[in-house]
């Protein structure tokens, strides 16, 4: 894939952009098999490939420059000058068009980007999420204070007229002078508060602060694969720990007698519950709890426990809890194979029966890995 930002060395996030995609897959596959050297070669299934461009449904843009010349993108690693990334080819074409419009809209609206050196200005980030099922957008302005809200509100009508697909608009207040992406306070500027997404016929509700996979094409296959594995095992009870907005639990519920989804973020749990209501699923329960605390409080494990932890992994304590609870099956989905490999060392009673990786982040070293572990 051709990328002008990579060719000009203005953005090097996609470190393997100039490597043929087939070679990227081979290199990543070999690296994962080496990392998980204890996993039998026969356990590995073929990797799930990504589209090489227009594959991301999220954009996180730093607001840079000045009010008369704002830039959405990143700072140059060489000299700190603003670099616009509104036409990054990983984004869909309608996302690129919207980002380019927003960059000009910020200028004509007179909204000053935040300057971290001078500690002045208002707009810190522009966060964009796209629903691939509906082609609709959620737009979030991360601002230092409420000072810019009047200008944002005043100029919203022409933004919405130019891009009626922008369904949800909000302002997130992040007053702290540090590299935090968002603050606690979310102010909605539209009647709609969430996006509707759909994978494999399963409705998903996306709210501003909920974690959501960034590559919808690959995410759909990740959920479908977990569903198929669970359908083969037919568990009586299943737990989905770190369930987020419920993607795995919602897909797997038809193939288990009871499914319990646990997630500490209450907003994500509210989204998951709404999806379950839309599907009319009666054997699925979601609770806003800490996954480790929930696991520790149980005296008897489910037949199958699915875990999808953040990049830090399960950690030794939770891994050892799961080892003691001794479910017959574990399905572990990870966005960080290194911490996943460390966690597996604390699960000595389990053998990896099936392993597959999903190229959620093409042109990088990152991979989403999912494994089926069976207690011996």
From Swiss-Prot:
Question: Carries keyword Acetylation?
Answer: no
Instruction: Quote the SUPFAM superfamilies the UniProt record gives.
Output: S-adenosyl-L-methionine-dependent methyltransferases
Instruction: Name the family.
Output: Belongs to the class I-like SAM-binding methyltransferase superfamily. RNA M5U methyltransferase family. RlmC subfamily.
Q: Which residues form the active site?
A: 335
Q: Which PANTHER family match?
A: RNA M5U METHYLTRANSFERASE (PTHR11061), TRNA (URACIL(54)-C(5))-METHYLTRANSFERASE (PTHR11061:SF30)
GO terms classed as biological process: rRNA base methylation
Q: Where does [4Fe-4S] cluster bind?
A: 3, 11, 14, 88
Q: Where does S-adenosyl-L-methionine bind?
A: 213, 242, 263, 308
InterPro entries per UniProt? 23SrRNA_MeTrfase_RlmC (IPR011825), MeTrfase_TrmA_AS (IPR030390), SAM-dependent_MTases_sf (IPR029063), U5_MeTrfase_fam (IPR010280)
Q: What is its EC number?
A: 2.1.1.189
Q: Which organism is it from?
A: Vibrio vulnificus (strain YJ016)
MF (Gene Ontology):
4 iron, 4 sulfur cluster binding; iron ion binding; rRNA (uridine-C5-)-methyltransferase activity
Q: Which cysteines are joined by disulfide bonds?
A: none
Protein's name according to its UniProt entry: 23S rRNA (uracil(747)-C(5))-methyltransferase RlmC
Looking up Pfam families in the UniProt record yields: tRNA_U5-meth_tr (PF05958)
Give the record's keywords alphabetically. Answer: 4Fe-4S, Iron, Iron-sulfur, Metal-binding, Methyltransferase, rRNA processing, S-adenosyl-L-methionine, Transferase
The domain of life for this entry's organism is Bacteria
């Amino acid at each position: 894939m051709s990328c002008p930002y990579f060719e000009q060395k203005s953005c090097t996030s996609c470190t393997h952009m100039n490597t043929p995609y087939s070679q990227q897959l081979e290199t990543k596959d070999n690296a994962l098999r080496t990392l998980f050297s204890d996993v039998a070669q026969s356990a590995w299934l073929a990797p799930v490939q990504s589209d090489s461009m227009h594959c991301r449904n999220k954009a996180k843009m730093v607001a840079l420059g000045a009010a008369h010349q704002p830039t959405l993108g990143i700072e140059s690693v060489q000299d700190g000058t603003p670099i616009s990334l509104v036409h990054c080819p990983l984004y869909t074409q309608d996302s690129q068009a919207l980002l380019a419009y927003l960059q000009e809209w910020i200028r004509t609206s007179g909204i000053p980007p935040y300057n971290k050196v001078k500690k002045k200005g208002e707009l810190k980030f522009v966060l964009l999420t796209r629903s691939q099922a509906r082609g609709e957008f959620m737009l979030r302005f991360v601002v230092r204070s409420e000072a810019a809200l009047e200008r944002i509100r005043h100029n919203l009508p022409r933004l919405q007229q130019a891009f009626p697909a922008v369904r949800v608009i909000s302002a997130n207040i992040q007053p702290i002078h540090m590299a935090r992406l968002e603050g606690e306070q979310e102010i909605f500027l539209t009647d709609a508060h969430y996006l509707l997404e759909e994978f494999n016929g399963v409705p998903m509700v996306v709210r501003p602060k909920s974690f959501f996979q960034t590559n919808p094409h690959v995410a759909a296959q990740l959920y479908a694969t977990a569903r198929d594995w669970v359908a083969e095992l037919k568990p009586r009870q299943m737990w989905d720990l770190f369930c987020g907005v419920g993607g795995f639990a919602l897909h797997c519920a038809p193939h288990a007698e009871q499914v319990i989804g646990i997630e500490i973020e209450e907003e994500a749990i509210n989204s998951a519950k709404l999806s379950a209501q839309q599907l009319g699923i009666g054997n699925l329960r979601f609770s806003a709890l800490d996954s480790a605390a929930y696991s520790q409080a149980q005296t008897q494990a489910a037949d199958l426990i699915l875990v999808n932890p953040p990049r830090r992994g399960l950690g030794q304590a939770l891994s050892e809890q799961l080892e003691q609870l001794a479910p017959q099956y574990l399905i572990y989905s990870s966005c960080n194979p290194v911490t996943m490999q460390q966690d597996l060392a604390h699960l000595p009673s389990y053998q990896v029966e099936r392993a597959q990786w999903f190229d959620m982040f093409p042109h990088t070293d990152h991979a989403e890995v999912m494994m089926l572990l069976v207690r011996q």
